[in-house]
C-alpha cells in the first residue's frame, strides 16, 4: 500500500474511497489538516449540541401551540443532535492520522448515523417545503391533508426511509488494519458482495451516486419546484398588511433560508463525491493531479457539510422572533427555578406558551 492508499483509508463516514482509483498515485496529506479538522469538528460538536438541544426543548415545551413546521424543525434538530455526538470520535480519528481506535461497532454505528442525518435532514426540509406549498398554494383545499395523523405518518416515513437508505454503511463499514503503517482505518469493505476484481469499483460508484441523487439532488429539485409555485402565489395574492400573511411570509423566509443554507453546505461534498464516482467509471478525469485535488478537498467539503448541523439553531434565532422569545423565556425560567417560587415559574410558562401562534 503506497502513500495514496494510506491516505484513502476512507477517512470520512461516506462512500468516498479512492484506493482502487488512485493506487498508482503518490499523495502527501496537507499536515495542518490533522490539527485543523479536529478543532473544527469539536467546535461543530459544541455549537450543535447546545443549539439543537435548545431547539428540541423549545419545540417540546410549546406542545399546545405547536405548528406543523415546528414538528419538522424539531425532528431536523434531533437528526443534527444525533449526528454531532459522533463528532468527537471523528475528531480523534483525524488527529491520529486516520487511525480508528474505537472498534468495529462504533465504526459502523457512527458512520451509519452520519448518513442517517444526511437523509433525515433533507427529507425533513422537503416535508417542510411541501407543508408550506400546501398551506400557501392550496390553502383552501389542503386542510384535510395537513392533519396530525398525516404529519405523524410522514415523520415515520422520513425516519424509516432514512434508516433503510443508510443501511449499507452498517453492512460494509468495518475496521481495516494496515501492517505497513500500523494503523486501523474505519473503511468500506465490499468483500461480502465482490467475487471478481473490478466489481468493487461499481459498488463504490453506485452507492456514491445513488446517495447523492436520493439524499440531495431529487429532494432539492422537489423543494425548488415547491418554492417556484409558492413564489408565484405570494406575488399574486399575499397582502403585506394582513397579519396572517405577514406570519406566513416570516415562516416561509425561515424555511427558505434553511433550504438554501443546507444546499450551500452540502453541495461541495456531493460535487467532490460525484466526481470521484465518475472517475471510477471513466466519465471524469482520472489523472493523479485531479484525484489528488479531490482527496485534498474532500475533508474540507465534508467539514462544511457538517457545519450545517450547528447553523440551523443560529438561523432560527436570527430570523424567528417567536423562537428568540421562547429562548428568552427559557432562560428566565431557569433563573426563576433558582430565585422565585412556583407561582413565578407558572407565570413564565404561561408567557412562553402565549408567544406561539399557529400558521
UniProtKB/Swiss-Prot annotation:
The chain crosses the membrane at residues 37-57, 76-96, 109-129, 152-172, 214-234, 252-272, 287-307. G protein-coupled receptor for peptide hormones apelin (apln) and apelin receptor early endogenous ligand (apela), that plays a role in the regulation of normal cardiovascular function and fluid homeostasis. When acting as apelin receptor, activates both G(i) protein pathway that inhibits adenylate cyclase activity, and the beta-arrestin pathway that promotes internalization of the receptor. Also functions as mechanoreceptor that is activated by pathological stimuli in a G-protein-independent fashion to induce beta-arrestin signaling, hence eliciting cardiac hypertrophy. It is a multi-pass membrane protein. Disruption phenotype: Morpholino knockdown of the protein induces embryonic lethality due to cardiac dysplasia with little to no blood circulation around 6 days post-fertilization (dpf). Mutant embryos show pericardial edema and accumulation of erythrocytes in the intermediate cell mass (ICM) at 30 hours post-fertilization (hpf). Display decreased angioblast migration to the embryonic midline during late gastrulation. This is Apelin receptor B. It comes from Danio rerio (Zebrafish). Disulfide bonds join 25-288, 107-186. Belongs to the G-protein coupled receptor 1 family. One of its GO terms (biological process) is angioblast cell migration from lateral mesoderm to midline. Gene3D superfamilies: Rhodopsin 7-helix transmembrane proteins. Keywords: Angiogenesis, Cell membrane, Developmental protein, Disulfide bond, G-protein coupled receptor, Gastrulation, Glycoprotein, Membrane, Receptor, Transducer, Transmembrane, Transmembrane helix. Residues 1-36, 97-108, 173-213, 273-286 are extracellular. Glycans are attached at residues 6, 21, 182. It is found in: Cell membrane. GO terms for molecular function: apelin receptor activity; mechanoreceptor activity. Residues 58-75, 130-151, 235-251, 308-359 are cytoplasmic. GO terms for cellular component: plasma membrane. Its main location: membrane. Mesendodermal expression at the blastoderm margin appears by 4.5 hpf. At early gastrulation, expression is maintained ventrolaterally while expression in dorsal cells and random deep cells declines. During gastrulation and segmentation, expression is maintained in adaxial, intermediate, and lateral plate mesoderm. During late segmentation, expressed in several regions including the forming heart. By 24 hpf, expressed in the dorsal aorta, caudal vein, and intersomitic blood vessels. The keyword Glycoprotein applies.
Amino acid at each position: 500500500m503506497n502513500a495514496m492508499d494510506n491516505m484513502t483509508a476512507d477517512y470520512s463516514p461516506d462512500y468516498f474511497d479512492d484506493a482502487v482509483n488512485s493506487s498508482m498515485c503518490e499523495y502527501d496529506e496537507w499536515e495542518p489538516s490533522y490539527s485543523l479538522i479536529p478543532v473544527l469538528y469539536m467546535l461543530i460538536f459544541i455549537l450543535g449540541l447546545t443549539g439543537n438541544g435548545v431547539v428540541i426543548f423549545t419545540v417540546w415545551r410549546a406542545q399546545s401551540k405547536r405548528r406543523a413546521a415546528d414538528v419538522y424543525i424539531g425532528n431536523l434538530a434531533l437528526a443534527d443532535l444525533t449526528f454531532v455526538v459522533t463528532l468527537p470520535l471523528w475528531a480523534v480519528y483525524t488527529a491520529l492520522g486516520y487511525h480508528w481506535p474505537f472498534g468495529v461497532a462504533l465504526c459502523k454505528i457512527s458512520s451509519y448515523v452520519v448518513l442517517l442525518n444526511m437523509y433525515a435532514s433533507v427529507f425533513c426540509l422537503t416535508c417542510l417545503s411541501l407543508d408550506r406549498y400546501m398551506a400557501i398554494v392550496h390553502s383552501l383545499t389542503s386542510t384535510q391533508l395537513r392533519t396530525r395523523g398525516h404529519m405523524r405518518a410522514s415523520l415515520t416515513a422520513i425516519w424509516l426511509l432514512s434508516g433503510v437508505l443508510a443501511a449499507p454503511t452498517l453492512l460494509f463499514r468495518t475496521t481495516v488494519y494496515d501492517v505497513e503503517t500500523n494503523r486501523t482505518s474505519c473503511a468500506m469493505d465490499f468483500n461480502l458482495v465482490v467475487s471478481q476484481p473490478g466489481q468493487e469499483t461499481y459498488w463504490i460508484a453506485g452507492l456514491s451516486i445513488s446517495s447523492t441523487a436520493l439524499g440531495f439532488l431529487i429532494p432539492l429539485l422537489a423543494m425548488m419546484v415547491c418554492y417556484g409555485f409558492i413564489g408565484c402565489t405570494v406575488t399574486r395574492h399575499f397582502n403585506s398588511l394582513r397579519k396572517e400573511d405577514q406570519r406566513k411570509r416570516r415562516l416561509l423566509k425561515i424555511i427558505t433560508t434553511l433550504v438554501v443554507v443546507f444546499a450551500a453546505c452540502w453541495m461541495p461534498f456531493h460535487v467532490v463525491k460525484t466526481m470521484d464516482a465518475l472517475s471510477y467509471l471513466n466519465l471524469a478525469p482520472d489523472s493523479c493531479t485531479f484525484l489528488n485535488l479531490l482527496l485534498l478537498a474532500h475533508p474540507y467539503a465534508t467539514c462544511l457539510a457538517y457545519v450545517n448541523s450547528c447553523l440551523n439553531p443560529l438561523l432560527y434565532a436570527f430570523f424567528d422572533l417567536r423562537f428568540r422569545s421562547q429562548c428568552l423565556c427559557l432562560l428566565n425560567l431557569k433563573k426563576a427555578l433558582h430565585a422565585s417560587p412556583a407561582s413565578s415559574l407558572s407565570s413564565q410558562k404561561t408567557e412562553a406558551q402565549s408567544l406561539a401562534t399557529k400558521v
